[in-house]
From Swiss-Prot:
The keyword Iron applies. GO terms for cellular component: cytosol. GO terms for biological process: electron transport chain; P450-containing electron transport chain. This is 2Fe-2S ferredoxin. It holds the Pfam family Fer2. It comes from the Bacteria. PROSITE patterns: 2FE2S_FER_2, ADX. It comes from Haemophilus influenzae (strain ATCC 51907 / DSM 11121 / KW20 / Rd). Belongs to the adrenodoxin/putidaredoxin family. Keywords: 2Fe-2S, Electron transport, Iron, Iron-sulfur, Metal-binding, Transport. [2Fe-2S] cluster binds at C42, C48, C51, C87. One of its GO terms (molecular function) is electron transfer activity. Residues 2-104 form the 2Fe-2S ferredoxin-type domain. The keyword Iron-sulfur applies.
Length: 113
């Protein structure tokens, strides 16, 4: 069973956290189930970048990025080579080390009322 190690982040996970995950789990759901509140303005529909994370270790064990995710990642603040949208990440067989960036951008569009 792979482990997900969330690096310390003063806003989301001040002490850092290590949680168990199953192969095939969604990374955003793993975080939320563990009490790590990663923002997700679009409810995980790959329409914003608020759930942007940087996968410091285990990146290659994740599912491949879709064209839609790559397009959204181009808009993410602090984009790095190992950046992913946590709502689109499927946990593989390896442990992950995940950094939650200090800042994010919300590109979700809401209909005017």
């Amino acid at each position: 069973m792979p482990k997900v190690i969330f690096l310390p982040n003063e806003d989301f996970c001040p002490e850092g956290m290590v949680v168990d995950a199953a192969t095939g789990d969604n990374l955003l759901e793993v975080a939320h189930n563990a009490g790590v509140e990663i923002h997700h303005a679009c409810d995980g529909s790959c329409a914003c970048t608020t759930c942007h994370v940087i996968v410091r270790e285990g990146f290659d064990s994740l599912n491949e990025t879709s064209d839609q995710e790559e397009d959204m990642l181009d808009k993410a603040w602090g984009l790095e080579m190992d950046s992913r949208l946590s709502c689109q990440c499927v946990v593989g067989n390896e442990d992950l080390v995940v950094e939650i960036p200090k800042y994010n951008l919300n590109h979700a569009n809401e209909a005017a009322h």
